[in-house]
Amino acid sequence: MKKVLLLCMSMLLGAMLVAGCGSEEKETSSATGGSDKPIVIGLDDSYPPMGFKDENNEIVGFDVDLAKEATKRLNRPVEFKAIDWSSKEAELKSGRVDILWNGLDITEKRKENMLFSDPYMKNRQVIFVPVNSDIKSLDQLKGKVIGTQSGSTTEDFLDNNQDYAAQFAEVKKYGDYIDAFMDLENGRIDAVVTDELIGTYYMQKHADSFKETDIVVGEPTDFGIAFAKDNQALRDEVQKVMNEMKADGTIAKISEKWFGKDITTK
């Protein structure tokens, strides 16, 4: 009898240990958790002006400033973690990051795997070409090589619209848009498709190299902040402070700092 009892106790202890290990596999942050635990924000740190490294190797940007103010109001420390943007959903689902906050388009496909904040900025995918290019229409891009970022809304659109993508000789995918623009400048590709805000900002820094066309790829979208499906509490708390920041003019001031005017969703 003692042997049976000991065996049962051993099995119970083993099950408890397994359950304990399983609960540690995913550590998600919640707004109501300990105030000393940082909220980890995943971003592409080569995505100016939303999030990027400055000359001092510090991560800065419009979204970074928004996140700093929001977490300050939540009385929580914040940690910005550079991630592979093409693996962003896995980073969020695993709990390695608590939030994706980096010019992320809200799409129906992404809603299947993430919770989103309310939209805070409008966006569209636009084609940029070399400054001396005569490309002005989609027809002129037929048989040309275009570049975009892996994991981007443009990539999703082209993957889901093969007839549209087939008109191009090749769609090259890059880890970040900076590499795509470098290839465009060096003549390795004919055009770059990117978020209009990001492309315009980059173009302003390289006015002698690139120009924006009127060619829009796909439908207009909105930027939103993404959270894990099971982290409704954090989503709601961040949304609450974002609403406060909009009402008191803080978001408008941050927009004016980075874009010269308030271009956020009213």
Label the predicted regions.
Residues E79-A90, V171-D183:
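Short helix-initiation/N-cap motifs at beta->coil->alpha
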Residues K68, P77-Q140, K211, V216-V217:
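Acidic, polar ligand-binding/catalytic clefts
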Residues L17-T32:
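Bacterial lipoprotein signal-peptidase II cleavage site
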Residues K53, A67-N75, T154-Y174, M203-A207:
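Ligand-binding cleft/hinge of the Venus flytrap
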Residues G22, V64-R73, I135, Q140, ...:
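Extended ligand-binding regions for polar small-molecule ligands
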Residues A31-G103, E237, D248:
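Extracytoplasmic small-molecule ligand-binding "clamshell" domains
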Residues L104-E112, D159-Q162, E185-N186, D190-E219:
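A ligand-binding cleft/hinge motif common to bilobed small-molecule-binding domains
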Residues D45, K122-V129, T200-N243, F259-K266:
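Periplasmic-binding protein-like
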